[in-house]
Amino acid sequence: MTHIGSLLLDAATLMVTGMAVVFLFLTLLVYLVQFMSRVIPQEVPEAAATPKKSQKVQPVTDSVSPQVVAAIAAAVHQHRSATAKQ
């Protein structure tokens, strides 16, 4: 019975030692990060560059050119005639 008791005592000692080491490491890490945030200045975003206006501005047209309409109509007609034969 003393053998099991000494093993449990060793396990508890190892567990407490491990938890203490992890606690100390994390505490040190928190303070180190806080220190670095005070020492190192924050990054300042660069001022947004004003976009240059393009020299060539094409006029916007709401109508579609007749060539495009004819091409679309021909493509639709060809598609319908090809699917009707199947």
Curated annotation (Swiss-Prot):
Class of this enzyme: translocase
Q: Could you tell me which InterPro entries the record lists for this protein?
A: Na_pump_deCOase, OadG
BP GO terms, sorted: sodium ion export across plasma membrane
Location comes to: Cell membrane
Q: Which cofactor does it need?
A: Na(+)
Tell me the Pfam families matching this sequence.
OAD_gamma
Bilayer topology: Single-pass membrane protein
The UniProt entry's GO CC annotations, sorted and at most eight, read: plasma membrane
Q: What is its EC number?
A: 7.2.4.2
Record's keyword annotation contains Membrane:
yes
Q: Among its keywords, does the record have Ribonucleoprotein?
A: no
Catalysis: reaction(s): oxaloacetate + 2 Na(+)(in) + H(+) = pyruvate + 2 Na(+)(out) + CO2
Q: Where are the transmembrane segments?
A: 11-33
Its keywords, alphabetically, are: Cell membrane, Ion transport, Membrane, Sodium, Sodium transport, Translocase, Transmembrane, Transmembrane helix, Transport
Q: Which GO terms describe its molecular function?
A: decarboxylation-driven active transmembrane transporter activity; oxaloacetate decarboxylase activity; sodium ion transmembrane transporter activity
Its quaternary structure?
A: Heterotrimer of an alpha, a beta and a gamma subunit.
Report the family membership.
Belongs to the OadG family.
What this protein is reported to do is described as: Catalyzes the decarboxylation of oxaloacetate coupled to Na(+) translocation.
Name under which the protein is recorded: Probable oxaloacetate decarboxylase gamma chain 1
